[in-house]
Amino acid sequence: MAAAATMAAAARELVLRAGASDVEEEEGPLGGGSGLQEPLQLGELDITSDEFILDEVDVHIQANLEDELVKEALKTGVDLRHYSKQVELELQQIEQKSIRDYIQESENIASLHNQITACDAVLERMEQMLGAFQSDLSSISSEIRTLQEQSGAMNIRLRNRQAVRGKLGELVDGLVVPSALVTAILEAPVTEPRFLEQLQELDAKAAAVREQEAMGTAACADVRGVLDRLRVKAVTKIREFILQKIYSFRKPMTNYQIPQAALLKYRFFYQFLLGNERATAKEIRDEYVETLSKIYLSYYRSYVGRLMKVQYEEVAEKDDLMGVEDTAKKGFFSKPSLRSRNTIFTLGTRGTVISPAELEAPILVPHTAQRGEQRYPFEALFRSQHYALLDNSCREYLFICEFFIVSGPAAHDLFHAVMGRTLSMTLKHLESYLADCYDAIAVFLCIHIVLRFRNIAAKRDVPALDRYWEQVLALLWPRFELILEMNVQSVRSTDPQRLGGLDTRPHYITRRYAEFSSALVSINQTIPNERTLQLLGQLQVEVENFVLRVAAEFSSRKEQLVFLINNYDMMLGVLMERAADDSKEVESFQQLLNARTQEFIEELLSPPFGGLVAFVKEAEALIERGQAERLRGEEARVTQLIRGFGSSWKASVESLSQDVMRSFTNFRNGTSIIQGALTQLIQLYHRFHRVLSQPQLRALPARAELINIHHLMVELKKHKPNF
């Protein structure tokens, strides 16, 4: 409709302008249609406003020309005036139709107006109702807030009353003394369970009353008297019971572990005394310390004394040293020596005392051993004595910590109050024994027993014996070192000329050393100690020097080598039975044995084959220096060597084998030496063959008499000893 109206207006405007234009054309330029041109008196013209109006018209026309309907009308060549009238007619028809429609719907419109008016009235009433409801809600909200505040205050008062009630209930329960408690404390024996239960209740009430009294609670005065009387009664009964148990320790042949177990069952008794009657608790502790310290001292003094009676009667003395000759003590007034002095240098089965099975074996019973006429070395007695000490000390320490409720330094002090006198007595006895002890193996075994017992005590979490173990080791180590140094000095000062007749067999001093060293090395391997290895190293040096001094007494080098080899082989064999193959002692004697064996083989081959050895060495030296031509003058010597070897080698080898087997006590060592000698002989003859293959000696007629090297090897194998 708007577009049509716009187009109609535009059409009317165009029609008007077109009409004006036509009129002007009809009138012509002269007006009136006369065709004459009359000058116009227009005066001063102001065309500014007209130009502005034309501009607006142009813009309006241009805008209308953009309309689709106008474009379509212009395109089809429609007469705008006719089209404008048609449009105007249509607009009038539409207007009239609209008026008719409005008149037809006037009743509906009036009804709609009435309905709208009624709705406005209803909405107004609802607005009033909602306003009243909002006002009511505001008042209700304030009432709810008031109720919430009142409820919170009531909750706080309730919680406060409940808290007060709970504390008052606890206070009353803690202060009230029930009749069951009174009856149990006064009438029940201390061994009954209900006495212990009510004693714990009494302890709790006494603690509660003390706490409340500190805070100024007046109600405590009402029950203080009753609780004090009950406490005194309970303390009296507990004191009598515990002292009775302590006195039972004093009965002869009493197994004090039984009363200790009974005391542990009622350990709360002492806890009660400690919290309610410290004077009585101290009295009981002092009585326990005094009683048990005397019992332990008496028991161990008796046990150690009876234990020493089953020691071997024959013990090492100051003259039983490694370097002391067997004939030194034989005199008119001298005591008979040990059945065999060598036994004090031999470990034998003594080392089993530090094995796990023997270490914690039951202790020795002296009277049983005496009835069976059994005797033991000192280390076995030491093990039994200290295992009993370890076992009882561990049990005592744990009992003290649990029953007397102590730990740390306090537990150590209480333990030493009980066991201190016993430990001191044991140390004095050990010190007295060691002052006259010359058995190094026994002392060394005792050291290792202590090291193992110290580990056991640590595993049992009993540190109270740590200082005692250190004191024992402080006695054992210096004595062990002193005995070892005495043996070193005895070997150093031994004069070979005073040892009697010379013999190439192993010397008894070297045998003592081998047994002694292997014993200490095998023990030391379990818990290595560098100081022990140093002392053994000093002893080894002195023994090696001693062997060389004795060997120097032989007139021939061959006898010297036989003596050295026999002694080195014996010492090496004994050491390898107990010590590790890679120990310093084994490696050292292995090197010495190999060196002397090689020298002996050369000495052994020298008489029968010395000429051959000398020629081969000279010839190889000439060949190496490039002077092989000088071998041409040795034909006669070579011929003699070939024929001499061919005629005598079998007899020489036979004599050599017999000589070796006579010289060496160890058949295996003798066999090894023979094998080494035959091997070296084959190598020597093979080298002789290589020398004769030189051009200067290749044409020698005597080469035909050479023994085939393979034939020689086959023949020499026949002389290999079989054991």
UniProtKB/Swiss-Prot annotation:
<dbReference type="GO" id="GO:0048611">
    <property type="term" value="P:embryonic ectodermal digestive tract development"/>
</dbReference>
<dbReference type="Pfam" id="PF04129">
    <property type="entry name" value="Vps52_CC"/>
</dbReference>
<comment type="function">
    <text>Acts as a component of the GARP complex that is involved in retrograde transport from early and late endosomes to the trans-Golgi network (TGN). The GARP complex is required for the maintenance of the cycling of mannose 6-phosphate receptors between the TGN and endosomes, this cycling is necessary for proper lysosomal sorting of acid hydrolases such as CTSD. Acts as a component of the EARP complex that is involved in endocytic recycling. The EARP complex associates with Rab4-positive endosomes and promotes recycling of internalized transferrin receptor (TFRC) to the plasma membrane.</text>
</comment>
<keyword id="KW-0653">Protein transport</keyword>
<dbReference type="GO" id="GO:0098794">
    <property type="term" value="C:postsynapse"/>
</dbReference>
<dbReference type="InterPro" id="IPR048361">
    <property type="entry name" value="Vps52_C"/>
</dbReference>
<dbReference type="GO" id="GO:0048471">
    <property type="term" value="C:perinuclear region of cytoplasm"/>
</dbReference>
<dbReference type="GO" id="GO:1990745">
    <property type="term" value="C:EARP complex"/>
</dbReference>
<keyword id="KW-0813">Transport</keyword>
<dbReference type="GO" id="GO:0090119">
    <property type="term" value="P:vesicle-mediated cholesterol transport"/>
</dbReference>
<dbReference type="GO" id="GO:0016020">
    <property type="term" value="C:membrane"/>
</dbReference>
<dbReference type="InterPro" id="IPR007258">
    <property type="entry name" value="Vps52"/>
</dbReference>
<dbReference type="GO" id="GO:0055037">
    <property type="term" value="C:recycling endosome"/>
</dbReference>
<keyword id="KW-0333">Golgi apparatus</keyword>
<keyword id="KW-0472">Membrane</keyword>
<feature type="coiled-coil region">
    <location>
        <begin position="107"/>
        <end position="127"/>
    </location>
</feature>
<protein>
    <recommendedName>
        <fullName>Vacuolar protein sorting-associated protein 52 homolog</fullName>
    </recommendedName>
</protein>
<feature type="modified residue" description="N-acetylalanine">
    <location>
        <position position="2"/>
    </location>
</feature>
<keyword id="KW-0597">Phosphoprotein</keyword>
<dbReference type="GO" id="GO:0005829">
    <property type="term" value="C:cytosol"/>
</dbReference>
<feature type="coiled-coil region">
    <location>
        <begin position="194"/>
        <end position="214"/>
    </location>
</feature>
<comment type="subunit">
    <text>Component of the Golgi-associated retrograde protein (GARP) complex, also called VFT (VPS fifty-three) complex, composed of VPS51, VPS52, VPS53 and VPS54. Component of the endosome-associated retrograde protein (EARP) complex, composed of VPS51, VPS52, VPS53 and VPS50/Syndetin. EIPR1 interacts with both EARP and GARP complexes and mediates the recruitment of the GARP complex to the trans-Golgi network. Interacts with RAB6A and STX10. Interacts with BLTP3B.</text>
</comment>
<dbReference type="GO" id="GO:0098793">
    <property type="term" value="C:presynapse"/>
</dbReference>
<feature type="modified residue" description="Phosphoserine">
    <location>
        <position position="355"/>
    </location>
</feature>
<dbReference type="Pfam" id="PF20655">
    <property type="entry name" value="Vps52_C"/>
</dbReference>
<keyword id="KW-0175">Coiled coil</keyword>
<dbReference type="GO" id="GO:0007041">
    <property type="term" value="P:lysosomal transport"/>
</dbReference>
<dbReference type="GO" id="GO:0019905">
    <property type="term" value="F:syntaxin binding"/>
</dbReference>
<dbReference type="InterPro" id="IPR048319">
    <property type="entry name" value="Vps52_CC"/>
</dbReference>
<comment type="similarity">
    <text>Belongs to the VPS52 family.</text>
</comment>
<dbReference type="GO" id="GO:0032456">
    <property type="term" value="P:endocytic recycling"/>
</dbReference>
<dbReference type="GO" id="GO:0000938">
    <property type="term" value="C:GARP complex"/>
</dbReference>
<dbReference type="GO" id="GO:0006605">
    <property type="term" value="P:protein targeting"/>
</dbReference>
<dbReference type="GO" id="GO:0015031">
    <property type="term" value="P:protein transport"/>
</dbReference>
<keyword id="KW-0967">Endosome</keyword>
<dbReference type="GO" id="GO:0010008">
    <property type="term" value="C:endosome membrane"/>
</dbReference>
<dbReference type="GO" id="GO:0010668">
    <property type="term" value="P:ectodermal cell differentiation"/>
</dbReference>
<keyword id="KW-0007">Acetylation</keyword>
